[in-house]
């Protein structure tokens, strides 16, 4: 898919389709007024039937509108102008794409970024449009004998002359973001008989070959044993697939000497059966998505490298597979973590935090500016927040505020949960420093509390993406969240870096 910007009058340029908005009660957007004028009142002369009421997400496809060079004109209902917010704007873009897919149109001129969206500029509108368009066109058909093909291959956004420069930058950022999201989706959707910890590492290495300022290394099981990463090792010992922690290091040549890295740690359970505490069989196939934290990190690193952001970012893909077997770890086991703290295993299905606790201790060696871990960690977070927002916890209020701000900017929403000392008591164990679960109540919070015990050396945030990383049902598949949130967070960091230079 190719994206362009143009500030010229597209109504007189040849194309397969132009897309314009109309508001409820027959109010026209500026572009609709233009088309109506060029066509000598053709749009105003259409019957005000149910197809042309301008209600949100209505669509009316017109062919051969008089004096308009495009073969088709697609009218998108925008609802009431004063109610047009970011959520509705994205829905309008999605409606546009889904309608265009059925038309056979190849090259399209789109006027929808002219719409006034509360609190959003042209940069946001074009970036968001690209993200929605690529999501609507995305199809994971790698393992299907018949591939899904769409004719649509070029969209030109029509903007004013003064908006052109910002729009071109937005296209560059939007494409990079869409690529990062799609790479995260592709990795997450890959079946678990193919996507194991070694596959995560191979994918990172192959991708890194495109960039001179990216390098990839790996911590294998032998090195983990030498280091004392016994919690991480325990989780994967029931699987024939070796646990591997892949480390992606991106370092811009534009940063000052002594810059500390931002570290992203992604839970990469390439399949989570639950181990000895085995999961119910229903929907167990979706446990291939337990590596969406690692997929997110991979996607974000794509965005950072594609945009050549002036940052130092390290991404950790904490890969392992949790399987039952004669060598699997058991409820009742006590593990000595890399930090020296001991953990009593009460449930082997609370394995992600065991992998992460050692990974979080490991990254201390990088002397990070901050660390963010991303994990499909708890079903409790899904119960608390549903599938709309990721759970956010942090030991540093400014970091949490920056992430929440980025979530609002991107529309990839998060909600902060508490990390109070009163919750820590639920992790008490009679036999070890802590247990790996904290009982039925506040499960997402106690999981965050567990991780917090391994993050005293740096500013840290935790994103629980169990409810947002993939969809179930008819639209089953990875969402690519929260690549957009974290990419926006890093774009903000890069902007601050430039302004401070």
Curated annotation (Swiss-Prot):
The record, for InterPro entries, names: Leucine_aapep/pepB, Macro_dom-like, Peptidase_M17_C, Peptidase_M17_leu_NH2_pept, Peptidase_M17_N
Query: Sorted alphabetically, which SUPFAM superfamilies does this protein's record hold?
Result: Macro domain-like (SSF52949), Zn-dependent exopeptidases (SSF53187)
Known cofactor(s): Mn(2+)
Q: Which reaction does it catalyse?
A: Release of an N-terminal amino acid, Xaa-|-Yaa-, in which Xaa is preferably Leu, but may be other amino acids including Pro although not Arg or Lys, and Yaa may be Pro. Amino acid amides and methyl esters are also readily hydrolyzed, but rates on arylamides are exceedingly low; Release of an N-terminal amino acid, preferentially leucine, but not glutamic or aspartic acids
Q: Where in the cell is it found?
A: Cytoplasm
- Keyword Manganese in record: yes
- Source species, domain of life: Bacteria
How is the cofactor bound, in the record's words? Binds 2 manganese ions per subunit.
Asked if the Swiss-Prot or TrEMBL record annotates the protein with the keyword Cytoplasm, the reply is: yes
Q: Name one GO biological process term.
A: proteolysis
Q: Which Pfam families match?
A: Peptidase_M17 (PF00883), Peptidase_M17_N (PF02789)
Locate the residues binding Mn(2+) 2. Answer: 267, 272, 290, 351
Entry EC no(s): 3.4.11.1, 3.4.11.10
Keywords from UniProt, A to Z, are: Aminopeptidase, Cytoplasm, Hydrolase, Manganese, Metal-binding, Protease
Role: Presumably involved in the processing and regular turnover of intracellular proteins. Catalyzes the removal of unsubstituted N-terminal amino acids from various peptides.
UniProt family annotation = Belongs to the peptidase M17 family.
Protein name as annotated: Probable cytosol aminopeptidase
**Taxonomic lineage from the root:** Bacteria, Pseudomonadati, Pseudomonadota, Gammaproteobacteria, Enterobacterales
Q: Which gene encodes it?
A: pepA
């Amino acid at each position: 898919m190719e994206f362009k910007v143009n500030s010229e009058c597209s109504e007189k340029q040849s194309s397969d389709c132009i897309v314009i908005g109309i508001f409820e009660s027959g109010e026209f957007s500026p572009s609709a007024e233009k088309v109506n004028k060029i066509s000598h009142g053709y749009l105003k002369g259409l019957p005000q039937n149910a197809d042309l009421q301008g209600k949100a997400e209505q669509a009316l496809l017109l062919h051969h509108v008089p004096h308009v060079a495009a073969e088709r004109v697609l009218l998108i209902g925008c609802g009431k102008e004063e109610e047009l917010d970011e959520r509705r704007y994205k829905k309008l873009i999605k409606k546009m794409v889904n309608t265009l897919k059925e038309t056979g149109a190849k090259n399209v001129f789109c006027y929808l970024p002219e719409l006034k969206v509360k609190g959003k500029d042209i940069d946001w509108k074009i970036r968001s449009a690209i993200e929605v368009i690529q999501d609507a066109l995305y199809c994971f058909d790698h393992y299907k004998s018949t591939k899904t093909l769409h004719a649509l291959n070029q969209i030109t956004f029509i903007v004013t002359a003064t908006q052109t420069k910002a729009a071109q930058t937005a296209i560059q950022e939007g494409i990079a973001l869409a690529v990062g999201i799609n790479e995260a989706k592709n990795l997450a959707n890959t079946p678990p008989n193919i996507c194991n910890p070694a596959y995560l590492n191979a994918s990172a290495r192959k991708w890194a070959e495109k960039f001179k300022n990216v390098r990839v290394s790996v911590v294998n099981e032998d090195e983990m044993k030498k280091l004392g990463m016994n919690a991480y090792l325990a989780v994967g010992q029931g699987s024939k697939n070796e646990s591997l922690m892949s480390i992606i290091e991106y370092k811009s040549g534009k940063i000052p000497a002594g810059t500390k890295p931002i570290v992203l740690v992604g839970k990469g359970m390439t399949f989570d059966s639950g181990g000895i505490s085995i999961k119910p069989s229903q929907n167990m196939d979706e446990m291939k998505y337990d590596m969406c934290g690692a997929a997110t990190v991979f996607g974000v690193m794509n965005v950072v490298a594609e945009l050549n952001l002036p940052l130092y970012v390290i991404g950790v893909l904490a890969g392992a597979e949790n399987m039952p077997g004669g060598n699997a770890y058991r409820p009742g086991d006590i593990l000595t973590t890399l930090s020296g703290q001991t953990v009593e295993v009460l449930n082997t299905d609370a394995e992600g935090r065991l992998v992460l606790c050692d990974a979080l201790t490991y990254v201390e060696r990088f002397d990070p500016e901050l660390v963010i871990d991303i994990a499909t960690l708890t079903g409790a977070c899904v119960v608390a927040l549903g599938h709309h927002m990721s759970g956010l916890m942090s030991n540093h209020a400014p970091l949490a505020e920056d992430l929440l701000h980025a979530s609002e900017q991107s529309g990839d929403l998060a909600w902060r949960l508490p990390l109070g000392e009163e919750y820590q008591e639920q992790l008490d164990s009679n036999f070890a420093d802590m247990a790996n679960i904290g009982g039925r109540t506040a499960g997402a919070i106690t999981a965050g509390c567990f991780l917090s015990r391994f993050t005293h050396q740096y500013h840290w945030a935790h994103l629980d993406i169990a409810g947002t990383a993939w969809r179930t049902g008819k639209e089953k598949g990875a969402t690519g969240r929260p690549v957009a949130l974290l990419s926006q967070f890093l774009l903000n960091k890069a902007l601050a870096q430039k302004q401070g230079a």
